Amino acid sequence: HPISEDNRKINGQHFAKQGEVVRVTPRVHIKSPEYKQIYGSLIGTRYEGKCPDLQVGDKFYEFEGFIKPWKKRKSKNMIRHGVEQSPYIVIDNTKGGSDRFIRRSIVARNHNDAIKEVWLYEKGGLRLFFKNGKFR
């Protein structure tokens, strides 16, 4: 997907500065022995077989970006695709989608509290936007 390696590093560095252990995770086939080693905690959950982008402590985060040009529906799609991979999502909001619109997209897609955290990547940094059912 369109998230660059530089953005992954910036996002990983943000969590590392908070004292978290961060690991960029590779894409591996579910039947390979590496999958169980890397993503073992996902086995038996709705995310089994998925390969989120980053592990922060014991949480797996999925980064969602977009291909230009920016359109409103892209933030909806980023949330929808992100929640298919992990309940912890980082959205590329470099084009400055409004908080109101992103909030509405989360509420519409947060069935059974499937979304635990949403971070927004803006201006080279991360901002916590949603956590455990509450907007920040």
Q: Which residues does each predicted region cover?
A:
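Metal-dependent nuclease catalytic core centered on acidic motifs
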Residues: 1-40, 45, 66-136
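Conserved catalytic cores of phosphodiester-cleaving nucleases, focusing on short active-site segments
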Residues: 54-67
